Amino acid sequence: MYEYIKGKYIGINKDYVIVENSGIGYKIFTSGATMSSMPKNGEEIMLYLEQIVREDFIGLYGFDSKEELEMFKLLLTVSGVGPKAALSLLSISRVNNLKYAIMIGDEKHICRGVGIGKKTAARIILEIKDKLKPDELVDSSLEIDTKDNENVMALSEALSALIALGYSEKEAESVLKKIDKNDSVENIIKNALKALMG
């Protein structure tokens, strides 16, 4: 029913933002990634929307990119994955990282989402993997050779390890761009930590 909303950003809550348009304040559920991109209160924003209607609930879900919206909708096609679980996955991982985790079958990465167990992670991989394009195997921002699956796995593990150690995904990605991706996982992590600690 709705394609997008453009209006004044009013504020943020635990799992939603408020956008005012024509005197009406819209409660829009969203991911941590989109929340982190919110401007100052009173500034204009635009979110791409998906409306979910159930017997006892009508909700708007919004994202700052069409790519994130499409990934949200794709996750909802998986049995056992509802809006909360989908938002959780999009909050702990950028869209491209989530895509390539699914493509290489990285259940550990997917299980980081709240309410996502091993069985659900396996279903997500099974039901979505073939729907993703081969060139989406790798997060393009990490500039990995898509032909070398071992490098992809190593970088995925290194990225997850750095995040687990408390570094932000942005910090981890930034330093991993400069590391030799043909090295072992252990050495990639060691070299990344050296770079991060100066």
Swiss-Prot record:
<dbReference type="InterPro" id="IPR012340">
    <property type="entry name" value="NA-bd_OB-fold"/>
</dbReference>
<keyword id="KW-0233">DNA recombination</keyword>
<protein>
    <recommendedName>
        <fullName>Holliday junction branch migration complex subunit RuvA</fullName>
    </recommendedName>
</protein>
<keyword id="KW-0227">DNA damage</keyword>
<dbReference type="GO" id="GO:0005524">
    <property type="term" value="F:ATP binding"/>
</dbReference>
<dbReference type="GO" id="GO:0006310">
    <property type="term" value="P:DNA recombination"/>
</dbReference>
<dbReference type="GO" id="GO:0009378">
    <property type="term" value="F:four-way junction helicase activity"/>
</dbReference>
<dbReference type="Pfam" id="PF14520">
    <property type="entry name" value="HHH_5"/>
</dbReference>
<dbReference type="InterPro" id="IPR011114">
    <property type="entry name" value="RuvA_C"/>
</dbReference>
<feature type="region of interest" description="Domain III">
    <location>
        <begin position="150"/>
        <end position="198"/>
    </location>
</feature>
<feature type="region of interest" description="Domain II">
    <location>
        <begin position="65"/>
        <end position="143"/>
    </location>
</feature>
<comment type="subunit">
    <text>Homotetramer. Forms an RuvA(8)-RuvB(12)-Holliday junction (HJ) complex. HJ DNA is sandwiched between 2 RuvA tetramers; dsDNA enters through RuvA and exits via RuvB. An RuvB hexamer assembles on each DNA strand where it exits the tetramer. Each RuvB hexamer is contacted by two RuvA subunits (via domain III) on 2 adjacent RuvB subunits; this complex drives branch migration. In the full resolvosome a probable DNA-RuvA(4)-RuvB(12)-RuvC(2) complex forms which resolves the HJ.</text>
</comment>
<dbReference type="InterPro" id="IPR036267">
    <property type="entry name" value="RuvA_C_sf"/>
</dbReference>
<dbReference type="InterPro" id="IPR010994">
    <property type="entry name" value="RuvA_2-like"/>
</dbReference>
<comment type="similarity">
    <text>Belongs to the RuvA family.</text>
</comment>
<dbReference type="GO" id="GO:0006281">
    <property type="term" value="P:DNA repair"/>
</dbReference>
<dbReference type="Pfam" id="PF07499">
    <property type="entry name" value="RuvA_C"/>
</dbReference>
<dbReference type="Pfam" id="PF01330">
    <property type="entry name" value="RuvA_N"/>
</dbReference>
<keyword id="KW-0238">DNA-binding</keyword>
<comment type="function">
    <text>The RuvA-RuvB-RuvC complex processes Holliday junction (HJ) DNA during genetic recombination and DNA repair, while the RuvA-RuvB complex plays an important role in the rescue of blocked DNA replication forks via replication fork reversal (RFR). RuvA specifically binds to HJ cruciform DNA, conferring on it an open structure. The RuvB hexamer acts as an ATP-dependent pump, pulling dsDNA into and through the RuvAB complex. HJ branch migration allows RuvC to scan DNA until it finds its consensus sequence, where it cleaves and resolves the cruciform DNA.</text>
</comment>
<dbReference type="InterPro" id="IPR013849">
    <property type="entry name" value="DNA_helicase_Holl-junc_RuvA_I"/>
</dbReference>
<dbReference type="GO" id="GO:0005737">
    <property type="term" value="C:cytoplasm"/>
</dbReference>
<feature type="region of interest" description="Flexible linker">
    <location>
        <begin position="144"/>
        <end position="149"/>
    </location>
</feature>
<keyword id="KW-0234">DNA repair</keyword>
<keyword id="KW-0963">Cytoplasm</keyword>
<dbReference type="GO" id="GO:0048476">
    <property type="term" value="C:Holliday junction resolvase complex"/>
</dbReference>
<dbReference type="InterPro" id="IPR000085">
    <property type="entry name" value="RuvA"/>
</dbReference>
<dbReference type="GO" id="GO:0009379">
    <property type="term" value="C:Holliday junction helicase complex"/>
</dbReference>
<dbReference type="GO" id="GO:0000400">
    <property type="term" value="F:four-way junction DNA binding"/>
</dbReference>
<feature type="region of interest" description="Domain I">
    <location>
        <begin position="1"/>
        <end position="64"/>
    </location>
</feature>
